[in-house]
Amino acid sequence: MIKQYLLVTKPGIIFGNLISVVGGFLLAAKGIIDYPLFLATLVGVSLVVASGCVFNNYIDRDIDKKMERTKNRVLVKGLIAPSVTLIYATVLGIAGFVLLYIAANPLAMWLAVMGFVVYVGVYSLYMKRHSVYGTLIGSLSGAAPPVIGYCAVTNAFDAGALILLAIFSLWQMPHSYAIAIFRFKDYQAAGIPVLPVVKGVSVAKNHITLYILAFMIATLMLALVGYAGYKYLIVAAVVSIWWLGMALRGYKTENDSIWARKLFVFSIVAITSLSVMMSIDFSVSSASPALLTYVW
């Protein structure tokens, strides 16, 4: 039974988000790490993300059974009662928000709240099922964790936080479209209006290319503005150019599914590489006026 409660939180998604939280936190910490704050931020974000994933599993249980990838999820198979799932998700969320508020700062908590509301309230409940722009809206919630990690340290939403938001939001788009392409039949069967299904794979390829170009600019800005060092800059340039090259090869591919799967896999390599590099190659001299400083 414990295993089912763990699976419904989508551990893989939690782990992926924690990598970005670490990147944002250590970028802001600049080598001076407050370990209790670091641990509290990781646990707090984990709880909030877990809560969002459980709510998402509850909301999507009707369409999950139509998709090959999700037909064996816990709620689809009835291994946990829906009513219990709601209580579980609520407890996880409250615990996460309270921990971020007490151990980090109110700004970190409110960023988590905004990411949660966008993911559960806007994306999962409505946009995912009714709009081709659902992925775009959902990308904002996916970009929240590194910003929370960053602001847990700075207690200010400055240019660095804004660039992180841009990097991770832009990354989500080609990453998600790639999934929709190699899982095309799943999304089509479930009636989910993702871009490749609604507009076609050719249009999705154009969007993927443009988003990767924008992603490249955003990643380089983190170093050019002075938040990260030249080693980060080199890695950011290499992974962005390589990812762009993979996207361009999609115009000549004979198998869209295989190409999209490779693009998806490399997207994980790319964002992980950037998270690691911003963690270890930060710039101690960067300073930027806060766009929003939360004083409590």
Swiss-Prot record:
- GO MF term set: protoheme IX farnesyltransferase activity
Indicate where this protein is primarily found.
membrane
Compartment(s): Cell inner membrane
In the Enzyme Commission scheme, what number(s) does this protein have?
A: 2.5.1.141
Give the catalytic activity.
heme b + (2E,6E)-farnesyl diphosphate + H2O = Fe(II)-heme o + diphosphate
Q: What functional role does this protein have? A: Converts heme B (protoheme IX) to heme O by substitution of the vinyl group on carbon 2 of heme B porphyrin ring with a hydroxyethyl farnesyl side group.
**What is this protein's name?**
Protoheme IX farnesyltransferase
Taxonomy-wise, where does this protein's organism fall, top ranks first?
Bacteria, Pseudomonadati, Pseudomonadota, Gammaproteobacteria, Enterobacterales
